[in-house]
Each structure stands twice: as structure tokens, then as C-alpha cells.
Amino acid sequence: VLQELKLLLNLEALTVTGKTLGEVLDVPYVWPAWQNVIRPANNPLQEEGALVVLKGNLAPDGAILKRSAASASMINSRGRAVVFTSLQDLAQRIDDPNLDVKADDFLVLQNAGPIGGPGMPEAGYLPIPKKLTGVKDMVRISDARMSGTAFGTVILHVSPEAAVGGPLGLVRNGDTLELS
């Protein structure tokens, strides 16, 4: 795998052996038997990867979108923010019949990252409110993480996280957000 990534790596970086990464990789490259499982960069399974790094006003240091699980119709969309300030707030209000939420709103979970969580709980997969029964997907934004098997248009690992003063913490109910 490292041989395939060699052109993208800092070959001057020291390894635990005391050798540089370049020295470790300075061996003849043999086409391994697993090459059909871990594909070379010049022969990918798909043209584009499953993950996309996003940067913008809410994520100046980046965020992750699992493009392969996102709804294409939501990739370029705009919506009203419905904000949950913590995991406890989310648990208490997500299924409240009086929650002011519509299918085209963006659900935002703040303070669920490594410090705000604390400890990076697997909480980024915000459920769709029960009052929106039948809605299959919504844009969801969080500084948390989620399972790799989850699906939907979910933007995760927003950095810097809200708990350390990241801009995600400034979002309020009713703010207009745009994903593009």
C-alpha cells in the first residue's frame, strides 16, 4: 500500500525504526497478490473516491462527506438550520412533535466532537425526526463521527469543532446554510 502512495508521502519522515520512510520504501516493487483488492491509483474501481474533504465557512480546517452514501440531489442545496447544541439536546428534542423542522432543513449537531463529546462518540448520524416520516435523507452537519456503514448526506468531523470555538458553534436555528 505504501508503495502505491509513495508519490504522495513525505519520504523524509522518520519511522519507528529510525530510518526515513524513503529508506524503508527503497526496495524493488513486486506486484502483490492482493493487488486486485487494494487497487493501484492508476486503476481505481471508480473515477471518484467515496469520501470528500469539504472546506468552507463552517469548516475552515475541513470536514468529511461520504459522497458514496449522500443523495446527489442534496449535494448542491440550501436549507434552514435546525440546531441541537449537544447530544442531550438532540436526544430530548429530535422526536418532539413540536420541533420546527421541514424536510429541506439542515440538521446541525454541535459539541459532539473529541472535546465536546467528549471522546468522539459515534453520534454523527443524526436521525431524521419522526414527524418527517417518509423522508429518506436530509443534510446533517456535525463535529462528531459516525459508523462507516451509515448512509445519507451527512457532513462529519467539522473542524475546528464547536467546543473549541469553531464556527459550527455559531450556527443558530433559522440560519441559512448552503452545501456546494
Model regions and ranges:
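Catalytic or ion-coupling anion/metal-binding cores of large enzyme and transporter domains
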Residues: 1-180
